[in-house]
UniProtKB/Swiss-Prot annotation:
Catalyzes the ATP-dependent amination of UTP to CTP with either L-glutamine or ammonia as the source of nitrogen. Regulates intracellular CTP levels through interactions with the four ribonucleotide triphosphates. Residues 295-547 form the Glutamine amidotransferase type-1 domain. Residues 1-270 are annotated as: Amidoligase domain. UTP binds at S13, K191, T192, K193, P194, T195, Q196, K227. Homotetramer. It is an enzyme of class 6 (ligase). Keywords: ATP-binding, Glutamine amidotransferase, Ligase, Magnesium, Metal-binding, Nucleotide-binding, Pyrimidine biosynthesis. This is CTP synthase. NCBIfam families: PRK05380.1, PyrG. CTPSs have evolved a hybrid strategy for distinguishing between UTP and CTP. The overlapping regions of the product feedback inhibitory and substrate sites recognize a common feature in both compounds, the triphosphate moiety. To differentiate isosteric substrate and product pyrimidine rings, an additional pocket far from the expected kinase/ligase catalytic site, specifically recognizes the cytosine and ribose portions of the product inhibitor. GO terms for biological process: 'de novo' CTP biosynthetic process; pyrimidine nucleobase biosynthetic process.
Length: 553
């Protein structure tokens, strides 16, 4: 039978519940337990797919094509289980399901209420999500509840968790509460009162924390931990200090050193072998002891909130681990390039243009791509970054001067990139869309396979086949591909059914390393295994750096 750990937050949001949940999962997995994770989001949106990256951060795409919270990216990077659509659900999905049942008459004329109908539906979603991994036989499902205790939006989720702990047999549920212990510089001390009030609020709901994770900018002294224990009614050994560190991959060792996994295993009556975190220790060592250093320029329009590119940033760091390289990322607003020119690109070892949507900032990205191509700087374009690389090549090499995307100009004379109107999804079903289709859930989503052209850079990186996750509406227009290929562009992979371009590159005779992919490889990178594309990109940056230094000397 699956046991459940509910992770809640207090005082303020963005304390790192997702990292805490993923770190606990990593420790339990190292003890031989089968672990899965769920994210319960209290917002009314059906999913984050239509939310602004500046509000929500990155949208993480699962293997089965769900647009989910970025915390699912943390989950996949910390444990071996693959997340699926059922590992993330929202208030919007819960209400949508309940209202649909009411319309079908499944409630037999009863008045539909938050308790029991909404809370029952939440519990059903939780139990369904727990069965999504490990063939439905997970030992532990760690459920992160978004928001903070006291938010009106979170109350049905907390009530559902309380009801589950009451309904299931004893020792089936544990509660981990993450809270803030701020340091007040004017007083020169840590303040525990916010944590006391947060736990009090949780207890009013009927939930007693098994473990308190106390976030601070420094380790919390034992006397302060004892004070928190006394006023929160949580045993002192279960008051765990979680302080700021330079990499999130230190968190599993930090929690395990304070016995958090033992506390959870004892509460849930789980018999498991001792934890082995040697993999995490090695990762931390590699991060702290690089042999090389490169600077990558990331040119985007959401750079003021780097959470918008969370998986991409982590993928570059993973590549650094596996190439013994410290990867410094310079974030460049593409609109600044439009206003101030390309001087900001001159000291970079490589340039990356990530995915994105909309016209704003695209000409700045195209200018950065042109700079990379003309100056032999390694370039990686992801999703929109590939589409813009094709547009730049079409304009300045293939002499298709008006080349553009119908996303930016619906009436363009040369739609080198255009809306996909029909394609097969990963299950082989025909999907169709038009300009009038809903934005939510109408993209090409999820993991899909395609063959790779022999003799290409793509083949050297990936081998004969690529299997990556997608999230896009627009695609390189096959009508223009012959002219682009005549000018030197190489389409190194296509979808097997629609023959849609999946990867493009320039031959060695034109550029040492210029590469674009329509999919999102960052979603499958992990710190343990890295990712071949990002490792190849960092190696190309090192080669370019070495060549540049030789020219200067």
């Amino acid at each position: 039978m699956t046991k459940y750990v509910f992770v809640t937050g207090g005082v303020v949001s963005s304390l790192g519940k997702g990292i805490a949940a993923a770190s606990l999962a990593a420790i339990l997995e190292s003890r031989g337990l089968k672990v899965t994770l769920l994210k319960l989001d209290p917002y009314i949106n059906v999913d984050p797919g239509t939310m602004s990256p500046l509000q929500h951060g990155e949208v993480f795409v699962t293997e089965d094509g769900a647009e989910t919270d970025l915390d699912l990216g943390h989950y996949e990077r910390f444990v071996s289980a693959k997340m699926r659509k059922s590992n993330n659900f929202t208030t919007g999905q819960i209400y949508e399901s309940v209202i649909s049942k009411e319309r079908r008459g499944e409630y037999l004329g009863k008045t539909v209420q938050v308790i029991p109908h909404i809370t029952n539906e939440i519990q059903a979603f939780v139990e369904r999500g727990a069965k999504a991994s490990h063939d439905g036989k997970a030992d532990v499902a760690i459920c992160e509840i978004g928001g903070t205790v006291g938010d009106i939006e979170s109350l049905p989720f907390l009530e559902a968790a309380r009801q589950m702990s009451l309904r299931l047999p004893l020792h089936s549920c544990a509660f981990v509460h993450l809270t803030l212990v701020p340091f007040i510089s004017s007083a020169g001390e840590l303040k525990t009162k916010p944590t006391q009030h947060s736990v009090q609020k949780l207890r009013e709901i009927g939930i007693m924390p098994t473990v308190l994770l106390c976030r601070a900018d420094r380790p919390i002294p034992n006397d302060e931990r004892a004070k928190i224990s006394l006023f929160s009614n949580v045993r002192e050994e279960a008051v765990i200090s979680v302080w700021d560190v330079d990499t999130i991959y230190k968190i599993p060792e930090m929690l395990q050193a304070q016995g958090m996994d033992d506390l959870i295993c004892r509460e849930l009556e789980l018999n498991a072998k001792p934890a082995d975190l040697s993999v995490w220790a090695n990762l931390v060592y590699e991060l702290a002891n690089p042999k090389h250093e490169v600077t990558i320029g990331m040119v985007g329009k959401y750079v003021e909130l780097t959470e918008s590119y969370k998986s991409l940033i982590e993928a570059l760091r993973h590549a650094g681990i596996h190439t013994h390289t410290r990867v410094n990322i310079t974030y460049i607003d593409s609109e600044d390039i439009e206003k101030e020119g390309i001087d900001c690109l001159k000291d970079l070892d490589a340039i990356l243009v990530p995915g994105g949507f909309g016209k704003r900032g695209t000409e700045g990205k195209i200018a950065a791509i042109r700079y990379a191509r003309e100056n032999q700087v390694p370039y990686l374009g992801i999703c929109l970054g590939m589409q813009l690389a094709v547009i730049e090549f079409a304009r300045h090499v293939a002499n298709i001067v008006q080349a553009n995307s119908t996303e930016f100009d619906a009436d363009t004379e040369s739609p080198v990139v255009a809306l996909i109107t029909e394609w097969l999804d990963r299950e082989g079903r025909v999907e169709k869309r038009t300009n009038a289709s809903d934005l939510g859930g109408t993209m090409r989503l999820g993991s899909q396979r395609c063959p790779v052209k022999p003799g290409t850079l793509a083949h050297r990186i990936y081998g004969a086949e690529v299997n990556e996750r997608h999230r896009h509406r627009y695609e390189v227009n096959n009508t223009y591909v012959p002219k682009l290929e005549q000018s030197g562009l190489v389409i190194s992979a296509r979808t097997p059914n629609e023959m849609l371009p999946e990867m493009m590159e320039l031959p060695d005779s034109m550029h040492p390393w210029f590469f674009g992919v329509q999919f999102h490889p960052e979603f499958t990178s992990t710190p343990r295994d890295g990712h071949p594309l990002f490792s190849a990109f960092i190696k190309a940056a090192l080669i370019h750096q070495d060549a540049t230094l030789k020219q200067v000397s």
